[in-house]
Swiss-Prot record:
One of its GO terms (molecular function) is structural constituent of ribosome. SMART domains: Ribosomal_S19e (SM01413). Signal peptide: none annotated. PROSITE patterns: RIBOSOMAL_S19E. One of its GO terms (biological process) is translation. It comes from Pyrococcus horikoshii (strain ATCC 700860 / DSM 12428 / JCM 9974 / NBRC 100139 / OT-3). May be involved in maturation of the 30S ribosomal subunit. This is Small ribosomal subunit protein eS19.
Amino acid sequence: MATVYDVPGDLLVERVAQRLKEIPEIKPPEWAPFVKTGRHKERLPEQEDWWYYRVASILRRVYIDGPVGIERLRTYYGGRKNRGHAPERFYKAGGSIIRKALQQLEAAGFIEKVPGKGRVVTPKGRSFLDKIATELKKELEEIIPELKKY
């Protein structure tokens, strides 16, 4: 059985985002169409369903890095801000988006809080991601036969 580590992250996040759309606990908040994802961004996200991709990415990140807290995720999703003539500077991503996404993943049962450490993936969340990774790996092996040795 393949794990999250065995498949490309971008393909996995895309597939997980499609599956998360079917889960009733995961839905964008009413303010989602109007927010930037952090201070370092100039514009809103262009994709209509960007929320599901961010939630899928956060779930993958908790799987890989867990236990992980909001501050570490804010740093991961942050970036450089263009400040005109002043030198560029790193800014963290917005915390509300990450916090709401984590709360929705907790409500769905995919992650849980560990007091004093952060959030970790539950067995249900690990199974969810590993099943999708296994499906994706089988599809990739048909396209790229060299992947069968892994």
